[in-house]
């Protein structure tokens, strides 16, 4: 079981709604995935229509909808989108996305942290999409985010866990769920993330653009379940299993430690 804020999920596969060829195919694939948390971009929803082509089918699934602020380029724009989503969809959950660079869609760390602080104070359950930066993820946790969503590689790239070493540090130090988001292009990538210790993954492009999105959604479902079972079973020691502390050294060692230097300064202060 995975708990985020006040909600418990039995599925660790979260899914998106973009790039599907039709709402009907999207709905069928999402059902096959078993996902219980589905994200949707507010910019793609017609809030004036009670029968929106995206929103109406999603409501049939009986899952938690996670509106995202994709398209926002500043903290102010993201905060506005989150407030709009809360009013229109009656939810205080939001996936915080701020990426001003339209070429690579990399998240803006400064604006993301600014927006997260405001939204948390306003009572939102904030799940921020962010770079695989252990320091930033810790700061987002400290301001009250319910989870962190570091990228595996750029959105839609299908490159997998190119940030693996940093993801490991984030997972090791995080006290909130870690959801690997972006770049997961194959079920094997999702399995790897769960084996690494991630609490969940979010997948969109790899499912939506597959030759058979329904079959691919089911494949991701099985991969995530397998990855979680393998982690719980206890993976044996190997260079590919960083959960075993003796197999991989990630902690930094300074080439010029300041310990002695700082001690001398302290002694001089007391003289």
Curated annotation (Swiss-Prot):
GO terms for biological process: thiamine diphosphate biosynthetic process. It is found in: Cytoplasm. Keywords: Cytoplasm, Schiff base, Thiamine biosynthesis, Transferase. Pfam families: ThiG. It comes from the Bacteria. The active site is at 95 (schiff-base intermediate with dxp). Belongs to the ThiG family. This is Thiazole synthase. It comes from Yersinia pseudotuberculosis serotype O:1b (strain IP 31758). The lineage of its organism: Bacteria, Pseudomonadati, Pseudomonadota, Gammaproteobacteria, Enterobacterales.
